Amino acid sequence: SEMCIRDSQWLNDRGGIEADLTVSRLDETNFHVITSISSLMRDWSYLNDNLMTDPFVEDVTLKFGCLSVQGPNSRMLLQEITDTNLANDEFAFGTGQYSKIANENVWIQKLSYVGELGWEIFIPSEHMLKIYQTIQTQGKKYNLCNVGLHAVNSLRLEKGYRHWGHDIAAEDSLIEAGLSFTAKPDRSDFIGKDAYLTELSKGLPSRRLVQFKLEDPEPLLYHNEPIIMNGEISGYLSSAMYGHSVGSSIGMGYITAENLNQKTLNEANFEIEIATKRYKASSSLKALYDPEGLKMKL
């Protein structure tokens, strides 16, 4: 049976984002908390410092590996090596199930950090190589290839996905980061709730994470470039990369201005400065690629 998965931000008392991670429900009483390896000790400490009850918590990082199979053909490929029905009505986006691949037990969840149809497969470490080779062999006819973090970075930027440490951190709030949809203050209590509700009551923020796309397809962006709004420096890019699906360099960064919403952004004139030269850019609060998020849910 399916169990749900939630993207989650853990806040501090000021409402700042201390962690950005995924919580997967394995069964009625067991959960996986999944974070990036670079944040492991930080998030482990935060979790243990703030537990409200006394559950059993174990770091199983070294016991499991993860293979992420992403792309329009991911369902066809994986369906050939697992008995689990991967059809959309049987395996919805944002859910996970126990499954078997190459006769080994795995946990698979339908999620994507790159904005395409795909599954993340959590595998006991001793079976990683076997399952990797099974996927590679089966994937040849689908032109399966290995991709690195720069490719992932480009794809997640096109989808407007934030990266903790670059785009969101302890001094950034959910509202400033455009992540207030993840907060459910009416459902439960959480650290930073008072700060979040206070900020929410003030209306439109004066600082906001915005996505940018250069009009010129030639210049390259890397991050930290100044954002020019109506002739004045208004912020810096926190992340940037070439966006192959959208045909030019893209980035995101915080800008400071009054009454920030899509209307005020549309009325503003934006440029990004690269090595003292300024290039025109369009701005958006929505993802530059598949803004409705339909491709992941096919």
Region spans (language model):
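Acidic, proline/glycine-enriched N-terminal capping motif
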Residues: 6, 11, 16-18
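Short, surface-exposed charged micro-motifs
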Residues: 20-22
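Short, small-residue-biased leader/transition segments that mark boundaries at the very start
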Residues: 1-5
